[in-house]
Structures are given as structure tokens and as C-alpha cells.
Amino acid sequence: MRAVRCSGHQLPFANCAFDAVVVSDVMEHVPPGLRKQVIEEVLRVARKVVVLGYPCGAAAFEVDRMLYRDYQSRNLPPPVWLQEHMLHPFPDENLFGDLPTTWKRKIIPNETLRFHYWMMRKEMFRPWDYSFRLLLRMVPRFVERFLRRVNREPAYRKIFVLTRKSEPVYA
């Protein structure tokens, strides 16, 4: 595998270059004016399926704004990802309003708003963060089962599975 550094709105790959494309926790960092271009590029280089996951909508943005304020009130430096989250409003489901008819969309809720806020506040404290990571290593199936229970609405993050309805026509 070879790492390629590029801009998401100008991918240096041929049409339908990959069977699947995964874009995880990226769209909220893309300026709103470039998001449609990123989606167009991802669809262009994907042959069969695209999976995008991101914090979705105004309610998710507000949760991160509260978290950001919590860091400030404790005189703690917010993580870089959280600082970046404050730069642009989060995309919502309408990001796919112009989805070509050759693609179908499935939406999977991931992590409730309440759980995300609770968990991120716990991670502010090193003993809790360490304990959770230890638990994840020792009993991963138990943790996974628990985490599945919090994948529902109102969701902080949504996962969009876009599937091409038929084989692409190669130009």
C-alpha cells in the first residue's frame, strides 16, 4: 500500500478506481463550499460502495460546542480535532440532496448525542480514559456489545452507506 497525500476535492485517481471508498470523520473538517465537490470526487473514484461517517447536523455541532466550553472552563487545551470542529457548521443529511439516481443511500445512526457528550467529558480525565482503554483491550466483545446499544437517534454521528445500483459505464 502506498500513501497518497491530496485534496479531497481533487482526487488523483481514475474513475471507478476502487471497489469501495471510506471517508471517516473528514466531512466536518471540509469547508462547506467544498463538501459537494468532495462527495462528487468520492463517487467518481468508487466503483461499488462509498461509506461516509461524520458528526451530523446542528445538534451534534452544539454538543461539541458545549464540550469545547467545558475544556475552556477547566483551563484545559481542547483537542485539535475539537478545535477544528468549531471552524465550520457540521454537514447534515442534505449533503446528499443531489445524489445521482445511480446511487442508493442507507443511513446508520452512530452514537447518541447524549452518550457522545458524556464519553468525551469522561475522556478529559486521564484515569477514566486509561480505564476505558484497558477495558477495551481486556473485554472487547463486552464493550462492543455495550457500544452498539448507543447507536440510535438522536445520533451525534451518522454513517452513510452509498451503493451503486448498477455496474458503472466506463468512459
Segments (PLM) and residue ranges:
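Short, well-ordered alpha-helix to beta-strand connector turns
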Residues: 1, 18, 46-47
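Conserved SAM-binding strand-loop segment of SAM-dependent methyltransferases
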Residues: 1-12
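Short gly/ser/thr-rich secondary-structure transition/capping motifs
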Residues: 2-3, 30-32
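Hydrophobic beta-strand segment of the Class I
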Residues: 21-22
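Histidine-centered divalent metal-coordination motifs
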Residues: 25, 29
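S-adenosyl-L-methionine-dependent methyltransferase catalytic module, highlighting the catalytic core
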Residues: 32-171
